[in-house]
Regions:
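Terminal amphipathic helices with adjacent charged low-complexity linkers/tails
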Residues: 1-16, 22, 46-47, 98, ...
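Charge-rich, low-hydrophobicity low-complexity segments
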Residues: 294-417
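Active-site-facing alpha/beta catalytic cores
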Residues: 1-85, 89-96, 101-112
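Mobile "lid/hinge" segments at catalytic clefts and subdomain interfaces of large enzymes
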Residues: 17, 21-60, 186-273, 288, ...
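Short coil/turn segments at secondary-structure junctions
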Residues: 63-70, 135-136, 226-230, 347, ...
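Glycine-rich phosphate/ribose-binding loops and adjacent secondary-structure elements
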Residues: 1, 70-226, 356, 360-361, ...
Length: 417
C-alpha cells in the first residue's frame, strides 16, 4: 500500500486492512462530508479500473457504494471502540473524526472527545466534492464559522474537553486571512482541498463522478489524463505564499506564534457598516455600488463571540490516554517474536476475558509493518484462547495468523478481515 500522511476510514471500508492502516501518520474516521452530510457516497463502476479495484479489494467495473452510516457505529461507545481498534493497529498514528458543521455538532464533538479521538474535524458546507448533488451543495450543512465557534469550541471548553483534542476546520478556505479567522475561532489545523485542486488545474466543471474531467484531474480516462499539467511545485508555491500571508497578519496583530491566537475571540472586531444613501443613484450605479444590507446591523454576535471563562484550556494542551500499553497483544507480540521476525511456526495459548478488547489488532499492525500485505506464511502463528473474548476479537487479522477461541466473543468479531 502506498504511504499517505492521512488515510480515511469511510463507511464502505473498501481496502481498509492492517497494511493500509499502518502506512499513515493520521487515520481519519469520516462520519460525514461537508458538501453532502448524511448521504454516503458512490464511485460509479466505469471509474473503478484495475488499480482502484485492487486497492479497494473489489472488482473492476463494479460500483462501490458507501452507505450513509458506519454499520459498526450507532453510539459514542461504538465510536470509542473503533478509535481503540485503529489505535491498536497503528499506535503512532493520530485518530481523527470528521464531522459536518450543522445544528448539534457541538454535542457530538463532546462525545467524540470523550471517545478519545485525538483530532476533530469540523467540515463546513461551502467545500466538498464536485460529485455531490447540487441540492446538497446548496442547502445542506452550515458555515464552518458557526459549526466551529458557536457550537464546537464553546461546547468543548464549557465541558473541559477542549485541551484533550486538536480542532481542524475546512470548507472553502482560500487565504491567510481565512486561516487567521479560523484560528481566532478555535481551530488549530486547516484543511484545503478545492483551492489545492484549482492550483493543480481544476476548472470546477463538477463532473468528477462522470469520468469526463476535461483537464484530467478527476478521471481514469487515459486520453483525458494526458491533459493534466499540474505539478507539485505549484502546490508548494501556493502553501508557501499562504504561510507568508498568515505570518504578515500575525505580525500586524502583534503576535509571533499561532498558538497565541487560538480561541482568542476577543481579538475579532466587527466591521462598521456605513449605509450609503442610494436615492440619488441611477439603477446602473446602484447595482455596482455593493450597498450593504441594513439588516446586517441587527445581527447580534455577542453569544457567538463570547469566551467561556471557566479556567479550562481553549486549545490542545494534553494528549489523549488510549490505554494501549497494557493490552494483551503486547505479551503476544513478545512471545511471537520468532514468528514475526524469522517466520518460525509457533503455537501459543492464553486465557481471555471480556475486558480484553481488540485482540490481534496490534499484533497484525506489527506484522503488516514488517511483512506488508502478504503477512506471514500459512499457519506460522497459531494462538488458542480460552474464555469470553471482548469486542473486536481478531480485528484486522493478517494472513498467517490463526486464532482459535474456546468460549464466546462479543461485538465486531473479525472486523476488517
Amino acid at each position: 500500500s502506498l504511504r499517505s500522511a492521512i488515510k480515511q476510514v469511510a463507511s464502505g471500508r473498501f481496502g481498509v486492512t492492517a497494511e493500509y492502516l499502518v502506512n499513515a501518520d493520521e487515520i481519519q474516521i469520516k462520519i460525514a462530508q461537508g458538501a453532502k452530510p448524511g448521504e454516503g457516497g458512490q464511485l460509479p463502476g466505469f471509474k473503478v479500473n484495475d488499480v482502484i479495484a485492487k486497492t479497494r479489494h473489489s472488482i473492476p467495473g463494479i460500483s462501490l457504494i458507501s452507505p450513509p452510516p458506519h454499520h459498526d457505529i450507532y453510539s459514542i461507545e461504538d465510536l470509542a471502540q473503533l478509535i481503540f481498534d485503529l489505535k491498536n493497529v497503528n499506535p503512532q498514528a493520530k485518530i481523527s473524526v470528521k464531522l459536518v458543521a450543522e445544528s448539534g455538532v457541538g454535542t457530538i464533538a463532546a462525545g467524540v472527545a470523550k471517545a478519545k479521538a485525538d483530532l476533530i474535524v469540523i467540515s463546513g458546507a461551502e467545500g466538498g466534492t464536485g460529485a455531490s448533488p447540487a441540492s446538497s451543495i446548496r442547502y445542506a450543512g452550515i458555515s464552518p464559522e458557526l459549526g466551529l465557534l458557536s457550537l464546537t469550541q464553546q461546547t468543548l471548553v464549557l465541558n473541559g474537553l477542549r485541551g484533550q483534542v486538536v480542532l481542524q476546520v475546512d470548507g472553502q478556505l482560500k487565504t491567510g486571512r481565512d486561516i487567521i479567522l479560523m484560528a481566532l475561532m478555535g481551530a488549530e489545523e486547516y484543511g484545503f482541498a478545492t483551492s489545492a485542486l484549482i492550483v493543480l488545474g481544476c476548472v470546477m466543471m463538477r463532473k468528477c463522478h462522470q469520468n469526463t474531467c476535461p483537464v484530467g484531474v478527476a478521471t481514469q480516462d487515459e486520453e483525458l489524463r494526458k491533459r493534466f499539467h499540474g505539478r507539485s511545485e505549484y502546490l508548494v508555491n501556493f502553501f508557501t505564499f499562504l504561510a507568508q500571508e498568515v505570518r504578515e497578519h500575525l505580525a500586524e496583530m502583534g503576535f509571533t506564534r499561532m498558538d497565541d491566537i487560538i480561541g482568542r475571540t476577543d481579538l475579532i472586531e466587527r466591521k462598521s457598516v456605513e449605509l450609503k444613501s442610494v436615492e440619488h443613484m441611477s439603477v446602473e450605479h446602484k447595482s455596482e455600488a455593493h450597498i450593504p444590507n441594513p439588516k446586517h446591523t441587527l445581527i447580534d454576535f455577542t453569544k457567538m463571540l463570547a469566551r467561556i471563562d471557566n479556567s479550562a484550556a481553549i486549545r490542545h494542551v494534553i494528549d489523549q490516554d488510549h490505554g494501549i500499553s497494557t493490552v494483551k497483544d503486547v505479551a503476544i507480540i513478545d512471545a511471537a517474536r520468532d514468528a514475526i521476525e524469522h517466520e518460525k511456526e509457533i503455537s501459543l495459548e492464553y486465557t481471555i476475558a471480556n475486558t480484553d478488547r481488540a485482540i490481534g489488532a496490534m499484533l497484525s499492525g506489527v506484522i503488516a509493518k514488517k511483512q506488508g500485505a502478504r503477512g506471514l506464511p500459512e499457519h506460522t502463528l497459531n494462538v488458542k484462547f480460552k474464555g469470553s473474548a471482548g469486542q473486536s476479537f481478531g480485528a484486522f487479522l493478517v494472513p498467517g495468523v490463526n486464532f482459535k477461541l474456546e468460549g464466546e466473543a462479543n461485538d465486531y468479531l473479525g472486523k476488517g478481515l
